[in-house]
Structure formats: structure tokens, C-alpha cells
Amino acid sequence: FGYLYKRAAIMVNRSDKKSRFAVYGFADKVIAKGYSICIFPEQDYVNESILLNPFKRGAFKMAITNQLPILPLVFYDCKRKFPWYTSYGYPGSLRVKALPKIEAEILKEEDLEKLMKATHQKVKKVLLEDEKKTALQAIDLWQKISSSA
């Protein structure tokens, strides 16, 4: 898995400004070759009490700049199966839902904030409507764990 991940993933050191900007150049090269890319736009992942963190601009700016559509994906079970408090996670399948494609080809940079907000709202709505409620259960578990510590 590690070898494949390293070959396919665009690695970024979020604490290093150079590394963050280098990602754009690398992603542009991948896109120019006709490959699709998958970007997780959440600002932060470590606060388990938040259902869906705000999105960063990079993925959306890249879509507008390269005139590419966005296919939002909802990963229902990540908070429960891969939490930051590792002793409470467990292996298994992840449920994923592809939302309708968003045509970013017609958008301009001034549409960026609106695009980010609309995409965030759509993903969050689907998470809240999940019949299994795994993300919400993970938040409840985290609150119980952190309050008893």
C-alpha cells in the first residue's frame, strides 16, 4: 500500500509554505496529462467534534483555473473508522457517495467563495442525513472520551 500511495498521492507538508505551493505545480502537471485528481479540501482534520471543517480555497481555485468540473465525494465513515484517537477506530469498508458534478468551467475567480460555501453545504447536508449517523456517533464518542480524560 505504501508504495502505491507514494506513487499516486501528491504529498504536502501543510506547515511548509513552499511545500503547499509546490503542490499546485505538481497537480497542474498531472491534470495536463489528462489524469483526475482527488483533493480533500478540509482545513483541518484533528478536531473530532466538528462534523465537517471549513474548506480551503486551493481545490476550488484549481478547478476554476483549469476549467475542470468538481465531483464532490462524501465519505460517511472516516470519522468513526479513522479517528485521530486511534484506539477507537476499526478496519472495514467505507461508504462513499458521489454528489452531482459541479461545472466549474464556467466560473470565474470571483465565484470562488460561493462555490466553496455551496459545496461545503451540500456535503454537510448529506452527512447529516446519513441514516447510519456514523459521523455524528463519532463526534458523540469523542466528546465522551475527551470529557472523561
Identify the function of each model-found stretch.
Residues F1-K18:
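Catalytic core of membrane glycerolipid acyltransferases/transacylases, capturing the structured
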Residues V23-A149:
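Non-catalytic C-terminal accessory region of glycerolipid acyltransferases
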